């Protein structure tokens, strides 16, 4: 199960106790915010994009939107979300639970500047009924991010 992969990954960083398993869906920003009792912007949504033959992940604030010119300037390609049937095989997590923890090898993770507006954010934890309460600094460390980018508006 993907939540087990996320838990094992977070354990390496001493953060596995932060996972919240929910009894309701957290598959969208709105559902996650309601389930976790926070404002939607604090949901650290994980977006999966095509990049060459593989994929990249970008975590952004729940209310942020991809800015196509910024994305192309940063990554050298047009922003194209992964097709639904490619997400789990490429990333290692199913849609609704995609997170930066325990992803398949070779998938770079980037954090968008929109997250810096918050002290605490809530990414998913590998399935569509989970979340993790992390400071932005903990998220940066635990996601093993390749870096910070500015690709949202």
Feature names for model-found ranges:
Residues 1-153:
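Extended, low-hydrophobicity, polar/charged segments
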């Amino acid at each position: 199960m993907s939540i087990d992969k996320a838990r094992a990954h977070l354990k390496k960083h001493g953060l596995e106790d932060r996972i919240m398993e929910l009894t309701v869906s957290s598959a969208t920003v709105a559902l996650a915010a309601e389930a976790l009792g926070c404002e939607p912007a604090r949901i650290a949504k994980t977006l999966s994009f095509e990049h060459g033959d593989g994929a990249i992940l970008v975590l952004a604030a729940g209310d942020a939107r991809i800015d196509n010119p910024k994305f192309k300037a940063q990554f050298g390609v047009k922003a194209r979300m992964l097709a639904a049937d490619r997400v789990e095989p490429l990333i290692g997590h199913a849609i609704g639970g995609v997170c930066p923890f325990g992803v398949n090898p070779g998938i770079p993770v980037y954090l968008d500047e929109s997250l810096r507006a918050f002290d605490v954010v809530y990414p998913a934890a590998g399935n569509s009924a989970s979340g993790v309460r992390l400071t932005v600094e903990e998220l940066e460390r635990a996601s093993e991010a390749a870096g910070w980018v500015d690709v949202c508006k």
